[in-house]
Amino acid sequence: MDHVKLVNDPIDIAHIHQLLADEGCGASSVFVGTTRDNFQGKKVLSLAYEAYDSMALKEMNKICSDLRSKWLDLKHIVIYHRLGTVPVCEASVVIAASSPHRSEALESVSFAIDQLKTRVPIWKKEIYDGDNDSEWKENKESIRPKKSKSGFNYAACPCKVEESHDVPRTLVQIRVNDAELTKRLECFVNRKRDEINSQNVIDFKSSFVSSDQNLSDSCARTQSTIIKQEQSNCHLKVRRVNNRCGPQQMEMRPNYELELNKLMGSRDGQTDPTKEMRKSLPNSRLQAIESYMGLTTDNEENIFSRIKRVENRLLQLESISPEYRHFTKREPSSMEAAPPKKSRKKSYSAQELSAFIQKIKDGSELS
């Protein structure tokens, strides 16, 4: 039978022996943990125990189940733990077990006390004599090593790593001491805080303040105002912008593309790139393109670099402006032959077909 209990009164050891009594058992093992009077040179007056009762009892019952699954011959198991203040020389925990043979009883009690210290949520506080402050103590059994998230055993794969404290200067972005770096961080935080405060004053603080009030003591928290905007759930002003021109109005303006073509045609007539061409044909053609694209011309620069700049400019314009497709439309040159026009087939009525057939018959008879 399992006897598990948390008590606030002194534990009666004689009562524990009565719970272990059994005619079929030849051995009983009892562990009694008491309060000692010193710790690292400091005099201990008492120990104070606290526990999460429901969870502690649940874990103590699990320990009993583990003992019975490990040692099948156990008859009775007793786990008593005291809560509250426990003076020196008084029992704080008692773990006992009875079995037909001594090996099961001794081993099970040793295993149980280790599991109790590791798993059961019971906390101990040592109260010292004199001016020494009391301390909460942690059981060394409860300190669990940190497990790696990965299942790889790094200890089985030793490797030598040469540690070097010399970092190349090319990899260091900020070359200042700790004091200067801390100063920069503080200045950055203060500046962002001032920006937030000023924005809060603009958004939340009432602009109508009487003259008798001290403006230095006013703030958005004490003199805030909430003005609900019309047809809105927010007190902040919301503005809607209607773009009268641009790519967003293409659907609302059916003649937008025609107007754009006229505008770009008038613009093209204002400038004549051929006036700025030089004697060198490749250079003059590239210079005309650069002038048309709004790029600065550098004749001493490599021609491939200039072509690359023109390509980058084209990609940029195509990405930011939908109207740029106007430039990408290829118009047929005057030197090229015009594509043949598709001829539309004439449709005939039934009377016309009958007259045409009759004319063919008359011609065949005459021949």
From Swiss-Prot:
Its main location: cytoplasm. Substrate binds at residues 101-102, 117, 124-126. One of its GO terms (molecular function) is molybdopterin synthase activity. Its EC number is 2.8.1.12. Residues 325-350 are annotated as: Disordered. Belongs to the MoaE family. MOCS2B subfamily. This is Molybdopterin synthase catalytic subunit. It comes from Drosophila melanogaster (Fruit fly). The lineage of its organism: Eukaryota, Metazoa, Ecdysozoa, Arthropoda, Hexapoda.
